[in-house]
């Protein structure tokens, strides 16, 4: 599965806009074909990605966009720190299961 993320610091892509923008095949294909930032903004609006005021998405993360291939069946989430997005896989995370009153040590 292809996912668009922006690794550069400053502004994320889907984490600063509509989360569905990370997975939209139309946006991914356009990016892979070399679309410009302005044309991507127009495409996002055509696809219905506008904020609550009807404004187009913020394109600050566009310059650092990349396509990441996620293996089929993988549990993942898009994380963001200071605008830099990254993929976190379930098995790479520290998850705890609540059982009983106290966690067994």
Q: What positions do the PLM features span?
A:
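Catalytic phosphate/metal-binding cores of nucleic-acid and nucleotide-processing enzymes, i.e., regions
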Residues: 1-105
């Amino acid at each position: 599965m292809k996912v668009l993320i922006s690794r550069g610091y400053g502004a994320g892509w889907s984490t600063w806009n509509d989360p569905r923008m990370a997975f939209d095949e139309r946006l991914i294909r356009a990016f892979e074909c070399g679309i410009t930032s302005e044309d991507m903004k127009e495409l996002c609006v055509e696809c219905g990605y506008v904020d609550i005021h009807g404004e187009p998405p913020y394109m600050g993360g566009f310059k650092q966009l990349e396509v990441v291939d996620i293996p089929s069946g993988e549990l993942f989430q898009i994380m963001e720190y200071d605008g830099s997005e990254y993929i976190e896989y379930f098995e790479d995370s520290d998850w705890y299961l609540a059982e009983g009153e106290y966690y067994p040590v």
